[in-house]
Amino acid sequence: DEALAKPSIVAFAKEERDDAALSVSFERSDDGSVAVRAQGMDEVPLAADTVAELDEALFGPEGKASCARAFAEGAGEAPASEPVEIPVAVGPMPETLTFDEALEWGVIEGFSSFTTEFSTGSGTQNRQHNIALVSQMLDNSVVEPGGRWSFNDTSGERTSERGFLSAGAIVNGEYSDEEGGGVCQVATTVFNAVYNAGLPVPKRYNHTLYIASYPEGRDAAVSWPDLDLVWENDTESAVLMRVTCAESSVTATLYGVDPGYAVSTRVGEWEEGEKHKTKRVVDESLSPGTSSVKTRGTDGRRISITRVVKDRAGNVLHEDEFSSEYAPITEVVVVGPDTPADDAPTSGPPEDEEGSR
């Protein structure tokens, strides 16, 4: 079956060839399609021809399986014990490939990918919309060799005029609604895909408040125009980044010629930061003397992680420290009228709040 055999044939051909001189470029069309041009690779594996030759060698009139069947029935000689070896058929490299052709023929591959999940519960529709919208804006980003990619430059300002809605975000250390709330989740997803690829990240900011759903010290916050996420392509070939949004997740994948970087991480110890404060908010609709915690307070803390990037030979290319300092979360206590200042909360857990993840 060609569909089943093709991945194995392409993988074998890739192992046999020398990709040291291979580089690719990407060309985007207005209709969203991507064309690929390859340099340093003159041939592509022809899976269909290879499968046909293999089929003939195994099941043809003189094939090994046919001979074995005839021998079992008392006719002919026993087939040779050596395995059947068929060279991979090759053809000339087209001047231009579609993205899918380049992927199927092993000219390019997805060499780093990262996925984060988000809530689809009641009240999150605006946030989901913003995540999907900014993902579309970032999708099919191309970074040339030696080039830089910027989240803010690529997406532009996140405003209502450009289709963004008001949703939960972290603003000045507190959870609030802001146009474009939620896009930081996409920034975090991109950052981790680039982090795992071993590509340089000259600019990255952590969120003001800690978000436990992300790897320790590996969140990324963006805010127009001050907070940006920037990464660089230090390879000899162009990199295409695809950002896709599913029903409850977003994925960033880097495509191109795999540089073969090996990435490891040293995670430091958490250190104590600033202590949290408590704020009382009077709600006249509550019964006198009652109180409840709206937002549970959390002390600030900080952490540093170190990424070590090595080449295929095991040589250290660079070590990168990413430090993150998270502010405390103010505890918000909602009280009814005439509640004494020293009264502790008496009812209700803190409400779930979702920030700019």
Cite the ranges covered by each PLM segment.
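Short, surface-exposed ligand-recognition loops at beta-strand->loop->(often short) alpha-helix junctions
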Residues: 1-3
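Well-ordered beta-sheet/strand-loop patches within structured domains
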Residues: 6-7, 11-20, 24-31, 35, ...
